[in-house]
Amino acid sequence: MPKTEAFDQHTNEYDNWFDVNKYVFQSELNALRKAFPKSGDAIEVGIGSGIFALPLGIKEGVEPSEEMRKRAEEKGLKPINGVAENLPYADNSKNAVLMVTTICFVDDIHKSFQEIHRVLKDDGLFVIGFVDKNSPIGKSYLANKDKSVFYKDAVFFGTEELLKILNKTGFKINNTYQTVFGKLDEITKVQDVLSGYGKGSFIVIKAQKK
């Protein structure tokens, strides 16, 4: 069952977060740009309001939240009503797939990754951006998830855990990147993007279809 209720009811709150935390957003976007290809037939799974898709040049994707789809359409994007576990795309049809802060909301992460593997062309790229549950911000989200409109039903993952799932579902790992260091309310400038993981709270994994 898609976890869409919070996003349908609190669409403005979701979009406003990126305005309030503009340096965090820009840092995350810079990390994604290091991993995501600049051209090719790409989609975003969990495109939301298009906050990441638009600057990354992605024009379409799937999104189960009706209100989020409306926001994406207003930006000229083409969101399709769908979920990660059952993608409405042909086999071997996409050069790249993006998922940003979406993995914590899927019902079945293994099936989701298998579906992404199916729609990717040979050697296609799968780029994931997420908050590591073992990071400072991840631990804060976990500790306060019952109070959060968006995260109360979320399932968080650690980087090592995701790397193992990617390997099991037919992907090899090309690179990992990290950014967002420290507490959210203490970030007052765009932060560096470093290779690897273990220090930053926002992690980007660049994987490739085997």
Residue positions per predicted region:
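Short alpha-helix
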Residues: 153-176
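C-terminal lobe and adjacent flexible extensions of AdoMet/dcAdoMet transferase-like proteins
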Residues: 201-210
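Conserved class I S-adenosyl-L-methionine
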Residues: 1-39, 51, 125-156, 180, 187-188, ...
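Short catalytic micro-motifs in class I SAM-dependent methyltransferases
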Residues: 101-104
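A short glycine-rich, Lys/Arg-flanked "PGG" loop and its adjoining helix->strand segment in the class I
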Residues: 110-122
